[in-house]
């Protein structure tokens, strides 16, 4: 199990990403636009750098919903490989069963 503080940190990052998503997108559009002047582009870069570091979506880490485990995460199920196997063995995942050949 991951530490509670790590789970809380990821939740805080998710809130920051949601809060600043529109602002980041607008600034990135100005930076990428060929129509914007160099001065406008530079101002947008400085404003983007002034935003909180954790407001970037790339800072988020996928974690297991049950344990908070960061590795072996399966995006389709939202679980780590270990918890997915346990749930599958109990028959809690519809249409999924252990391979046998």
Curated annotation (Swiss-Prot):
Q: Which GO terms describe its biological process?
A: translation
Q: Name one GO molecular function term.
A: rRNA binding
InterPro entries xref list: Ribosomal_uS14 (IPR001209), Ribosomal_uS14_bac/plastid (IPR023036), Ribosomal_uS14_CS (IPR018271)
Q: Which Gene3D superfamilies match?
A: 1.10.287.1480
- Which keywords are on file for this protein? Ribonucleoprotein, Ribosomal protein, RNA-binding, rRNA-binding
- Show the GO cellular component annotation of the record: cytoplasm; small ribosomal subunit
Output the NCBIfam families linked to this UniProt entry: PRK08881.1
- Family note: Belongs to the universal ribosomal protein uS14 family.
Summarize the subunit comment. Part of the 30S ribosomal subunit. Contacts proteins S3 and S10.
Q: What does this protein do?
A: Binds 16S rRNA, required for the assembly of 30S particles and may also be responsible for determining the conformation of the 16S rRNA at the A site.
Under what name is this protein listed? Small ribosomal subunit protein uS14
Q: Species name for this entry? A: Shewanella sp. (strain ANA-3)
Identify the taxonomic lineage of the organism of origin.
Answer: Bacteria, Pseudomonadati, Pseudomonadota, Gammaproteobacteria, Alteromonadales
